[in-house]
């Protein structure tokens, strides 16, 4: 007797993109929102090729676009059209509003890929209760972005006292972010 592995198909996958103030930060010439959009498009294409259903939510201080999960070929075009017009806002993101909206719209257990960025433990602590609520009914994956320029800055040899302290501060910020991911 031989066991054969067979992938599950038609699973619901939702990409959730934060359009708040923190996503305006740039790294290597692109904003964090641009990276989130690019990642969403790649993941959407992969999900559709694997016969999974893909959906989309965007949010900031208000709710943005909502696309219900679907595995039709036109879904990628819909996602592309919605993401083309997305811009960041100058407000902090409202994770409570997101949690309520997702609980209203997503009826079955789904994979939620949340593209956001937490630069310090205080913003994470503020959002954590709502993320835990999302996790109760779904499988939540929080995707945070690495700031390559900050990493490069922390490893530079200082030429002045000011650069020395800036390097220490950059290293401290990187350590804090690393702690948040654990």
Feature names for model-found ranges:
Residues 1-74, 109-114, 129, 180:
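An amphipathic, basic-hydrophobic helix/alpha-beta surface used to engage anionic
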Residues 122, 126-182:
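Von Willebrand factor type A / integrin I
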Residues 29, 33, 69, 92-96, ...:
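Conserved phosphate/pyrophosphate-binding and hydrolysis machinery centered on Walker-type P-loop NTPases
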Residues 50, 86, 108-109, 137:
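Structured helix-beta-strand junction loops
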Residues 17-19, 102, 109-130, 140-145:
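DG-centered beta-turn motif at the end of beta-strands
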